[in-house]
Amino acid sequence: MDPAPSLGCSLKDVKWSPVAMPLDLLVSTYRLPQIARLDSGECVEGLRENDFLLIHSCRQWTTITAHSLEEGHYVIGPKIEIPVHYAGQFKLLEQDRDIKEPVQYFNSVEEVAKAFPERVYVMEEITFNVKVASGECNEDTEVYNITLCTGDELTLMGQAEILYAKTFKEKSRLNTIFKKIGKLNSISKLGKGKMPCLICMNHRTNESISLPFQCKGRFSTRSPLELQMQEGEHTIRNIVEKTRLPVNVTVPSPPPRNPYDLHFIREGHRYKFVNIQTKTVVVCCVLRNNKILPMHFPLHLTVPKFSLPEHQVKGDMWPETLVHHWLGICQEQFDIDEYSRAVRDVKTDWNEDCKSPKKGRCSGHNHLPNSLSYARDELTQSFHRLSVCVYGNNLHGNSEVNLHGCRDLGGEWAPFPHDILPYQDSGDSGSDYLFPEANEESAGIPGKTEVPYEELWLEEGKPSRQPLTRSLSEKSRCDTLRGSTRSTCAPSSPPTPATLGATIKSSEIALPPPPVPPKSEAVREECRLLNAPPVPPRSAKPLSTSPSIPPRTVKPVRPQTRSPSPTLSYYSSGLHNIITQSDTSPPNSAPVSCYPCTRVKSDSVDPKSPFGSPSAEALSSRLSWPNHYSGASENQTRSDFLLDPSRSYSYPRQKTPGTPKRTCPAPFDFEGCELLGSPPSTTSAEFSSSGVPSCPKSASYCLENSEDNSFAAGMTKQSVSCPALPPRAPKPVEQKATPETSPLPLKIDGAEEDPTAGSLDLSEDQYFVRKGMQDIFSVSYPFSSPLHLQLAPRSCGDGSPWQPPADLSGLSIEEVSKSLRFIGLSEDVIAFFVTEKIDGNLLVQLTEEILSEDFKLSKLQVKKILQFINGWRPKI
């Protein structure tokens, strides 16, 4: 069956390239189909030396692994693979779990909590609203809306109590001011109570939820879809979409026959569907005398090497004609779709040790959990828990994928090493579903130790670790894709010293990691915080990529960080401070970072680099957070960073310029100014520590810092309050080497302690923020008016000297309390202002009517406050 004489020669006369390449590299480099010859010395079952092959296409196969069953549910015989598009039908049998755990039905959350099964399913749509209080000392409330859809799978995690609020409002003139500035009515009377609730994981939304016991609705330990499936006959695709594997089935009627079947499914046989798996295969046709033999090579296994025609390697067009000739012959004798739908035995050399996406390093062929361990080890080890096709019929079983044109980040072709395979995604019938595939290591490759998920995305550019499979966001880097299919390639093997620089540079591109699969520890942490995302671990300390940067010797004390929670109010969470693209950008004199600074020391700057950069360890110890700013380009400004709508909620909010109390010194100059060029300044500060008013919103820390003493005497301090957040990787700035500096003494507002003065040299962007037992901190910012500093010091009542500024609108709640104490008001009045959360912006809008009638103050107290607002200060 040689080609026609017009082609000029037969396959035996073709001059083959002396360089052979592995099949995975071949299909990623050249368009398919291609004619190839098995390299001499390669030993492949079913192939002879120097066999000619037509490499037809790459296919992504989705199959269900099944066992044959005897009476009594005993598993016998080898495993088989049934394609998801298998045309035969099956009938569900009584399941093992039905015997061990009979189906239960519930009519309320309280009934579910009493029985506390492992999981329940929602049998009808449920909507429930509850008003949640932020805390014992906080009168903010938030309406907690709960919506459950029919079929939602809920894994029970535990029980807790939430504070619910019963509010009956009073008419108050203060309400007008609160509404005017967008705040809730805090004058309303608030009654609180504790409500027991059931904490569950909703696998449709991938979120933990708190269901109050009062919530009514029908629940069951079996999915409503699965209960409907008990009757009738169903395709295998329908079964795996609507039931939870493993599941026992029988063959009720004679199944269709496929000429390529290697295992024959017969009427009356019983099977246990164990799990679902997806693998990428290269389908080929062996070209022999008057015979076409189809075969396939799974890319997760070791693949053979092939040689291409020399003309093809050189880019000539002649081999194209030869390829199309043989392709036409193959299509006459070979149906690739039928071949892809064949039932086959599972090969014994397939390693099933990998059951978690974190284990192993190849993803070409993947397994979901084994049948005998389907009881929950992790929340990730269930077909439905990984957002499979229950919620959108997205199974693909015979889709063609195109690996051609994929390059790695460095611009080189990315071959598939035999122990690193691409994470494939294929869109069949418009599907965007990517199977949650666990990894399997190739035969003969020793298993690698498990790597924490966060580290997978932190150390891609490090020479000490093998580059890992790309994130899904890199799919756009593939040059050409066929149809609606998509694919990703693994990065090439570890970089050599000559190419290390380029590799590290490419790794600095801020690519977000894919979403973290829900793990039991993370979910329990979520539930503990009532639907708050789990705080990423602080312990991830990546090694430095530059050996010339020594490790940091002094570490600042990092403040504790509290995750935003639905029980926090709209204002206390900081959400109201997010600005939009239309907002005015802040002036250069008001940096917007509120991080506890991580200082860049003189010995941490690479002298060869035009920019001083901190060491890797000196950067954030929480780089597992999606820090888009790390490694950003030099022309990116802080406004670009803060205004990007894709940023995580956990970054600081930027206050509008009308309320400058939210600004504070940034640890780095994002405008690129030389901060260290000026002479070092000498600054004195006082340490003090004491109690704060009951239930404060934050502990106010005042940082004394100025260019010189005379300038410091003429500047006012203004405190800002914002949630304590982890230090981020800063934009590199030009810096000059400075002598080793010591931590800057702090003055803690409202505290009593023996003051200690110290003199030290530092620049404006080098300081440590010390953290006590508070979750919120404030850093003083030099205010525009120096008038109040001309007044003599006076005690605030707690021992710390402080004078109010001339402009009161920017004061924090704590500073308003100090101001009232400064003018001699009683502690009960001050406590009332704290309870009502009166800050400077509210203080200047108070009227005599509000103070006397709503605040119930005496005439003298009202007069003092109004005169104080108008500029009066008591003389000492």
From Swiss-Prot:
Stretch list, region CABIT: 12-320
Start and end residues of each stretch annotated as Disordered: 427-448, 460-501, 530-572, 630-664, 722-759
Coiled-coil ranges (or none): none
Modified sites of kind Phosphotyrosine: Y105, Y453
Keywords assigned: Mitogen, Phosphoprotein
Region entry Necessary for interaction with GRB2, spans: 498-550
GO MF annotations, alphabetized: proline-rich region binding
Post-translational modifications: On EGF stimulation, phosphorylated on Tyr-105 and Tyr-453.
Pfam families: CABIT
Location of the SAM domain: 811-876
Polar residues biased stretches: 560-572, 630-639, 647-657
Family annotation (InterPro entries): CABIT_dom, GAREM, SAM/pointed_sf
Entry similarity comment: Belongs to the GAREM family.
Task performed by this protein: Acts as an adapter protein that plays a role in intracellular signaling cascades triggered either by the cell surface activated epidermal growth factor receptor and/or cytoplasmic protein tyrosine kinases. Promotes activation of the MAPK/ERK signaling pathway. Plays a role in the regulation of cell proliferation.
Subunit structure: Interacts with EGFR. Interacts (via proline-rich domain and phosphorylated at Tyr-105 and Tyr-453) with GRB2 (via SH3 domains); the interaction occurs upon EGF stimulation. Interacts (phosphorylated at Tyr-453) with PTPN11; the interaction increases MAPK/ERK activity and does not affect the GRB2/SOS complex formation.
Protein's recorded name: GRB2-associated and regulator of MAPK protein
